[in-house]
Amino acid sequence: MQWKRITAVAATVMLTAVACGSPSSNGGNKGGTDAVGGAQVKATDPTAKGPAADVEGAKKGGTVTVLSDVTPSGFDPTDTYYVDGNAIEKLYFRSLTQFRLDGPDHKPVLVPDLAEDLGTKSDDGLTWTFKLKQGIKYQDGTPVKAEDYAYAIKRSFAHTLYENGPTYQMDYFLDGKTYKGPYVNGGDVYKGVETPDDHTLVIKLAKKFDDMPFYAAFPLFAPMPKAKDTQKNYEQHPMSTGPYMVQSYNPGSELKLVKNPHWDAATDPVRHQYVDAFDFKFGQDIIKAQRQVLVSSGPDANAVNYSNLDTTLLPEVKDQSQLITGQSPCTNMYTMDTQKIPLEVRKLIAKSYPYDSWRKVAGLNPTTDPPASTILPPAVPGYEKYELPGLNGTGKGAEDDAVAKEVKDELAKLGKSNFVLSWYYSIDDKLSTQATQLRKQVFEKAGFTVKAIGVPKANIRKFTGAPDAPVNIGRTPAGWCSDWPSATSWFPVLFTTAAVEAGNSVGQLKEASLDAEIAAIQAKTPDAQLKEWPKIDKEIMEKYLPVLPLYYSSSNMPVGKNIGGAVNDPTQGVFEFTSMFLKQP
């Protein structure tokens, strides 16, 4: 997803990410670096019906507390693209489609959610028709109408206002490049969406989009009554269709969810409503929060943390069932602005980077977070393993005196001595501060000048994601996870000129020849694409070097001793919150 598709702390640690991948059960597969990727599969069940199958041993009642060191950028469905936001909003927003986790391995299967099926594609591939379930109500008991889905889609084109949201609609939907949403003059009329009756939604495309049913699982497709749209304040009082609804939201601090009395379990093949409430507390100290969860003293037994367990806490794990593991098809990256940093300087940054020491500071586990050498992670179809010299996610970099001298001399030859590297970090986050200190020390040793800008942790995503951010290193996305099981949710949305305009760009690449190559691959059949994406992956790294792949992530999240039903959702790399319950409410 966009600069959210991966939720990474700009500081150091990637916490979670949106992904559609091959899962594993508790204590099972923890990732890897197979030579050929493809653990993800596009499994679907177009005829799935509600209610969702009961979770074994589930009980009702109580409150689950989520102690999160991450501070989400917000919870507007149009503006949501970070995986933690997607996972949390799944509790109270329903979309046209959704992923259900099947069997003991929690395999992700795409199923109808508010739609009756997974949509019908026209013969020319340019129209998708979704029949909508009848009798669905919002939290206040008012009926959901087809026009509410249409309005939500129109709203997603107001990208200057909701700049964090996904942008496939701008590329694929009819008039997507020119329509600017419902708030401008004439914005009520949009040819790309029709509602011929109150239970039918028609989406018209500018070009074929076979992955439309997968995209329809995003929160931006949650219905929204036009009369209830308060724009940037909508996240305070959104209209819920899921099992929970917002009781209160204090941005940057806390989100409280309570039961939605008008949620109809019989229509929902995915979600449950076991606990009475969820209390999300953001901006927590990661070590303190994870230790609280592991110790599980008093109310902390009812708590979880959705970041990977810091390696310093591994000796404190007494019960392996308190760690929820699984694949998360994501790559954490260190981005470099190609419009501000010359290629030869980018190569010297790569040569200087202190990979090994950074991994220690970030508390990474070599088993769950193996070093990366490619853009695509191993689980994604289209991955092929390769390693370019000095770009395998390991090494001392300019901590080595000889390397530091080489880099300094090469900078001088380029006329770039004291080249300024600038980035944001969270001034009130210990790990972020430590990582910045490490990188600053190493880069300055290698002859760079460092300008590190400290900002509050609660606002870090806002700063790193700003289109005009006055920095040249570490802009979001700081990593990426599959929007669905395909490399088409990577290269076209991250490495094209259109990605810069949409706010998703990794490295701000604007290369017409690369745009043309990617477009040509998109026009091929899915099988043919699989052979081409690995070439693009390697070409981007060899020819442009907009990013340093750091590590492939999988999930390793701590839960309190009284938490039941906790599983990793491999489509998010976060918990499947709707299956959680308290063993002793």
Please give the residue ranges for each predicted region.
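Structural transition elements
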Residues: D369-E410, I427-Q434
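N-terminal lobe/hinge region of extracytoplasmic solute-binding protein
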Residues: L67-D123, M239
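Extracytoplasmic/peripheral linker and loop segments enriched in polar/acidic and small residues
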Residues: G50-A52, G57, R359, G395-K396, ...
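Ligand-site clamp/hinge motif
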Residues: K228-M239, H262-P315, P329
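Gly/Pro-rich hinge or "lid" segments in bacterial periplasmic/extracellular proteins
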Residues: L101-D105, K204-Q273, A277
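Periplasmic-binding protein-like
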Residues: Q339-G382, Q434-A435, I540-P549
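Surface-exposed binding/hinge segments that line
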Residues: K131, D148-A150, R155-P225, N250
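Long beta-strand-rich cores associated with HINT superfamily self-processing modules
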Residues: M557-P585
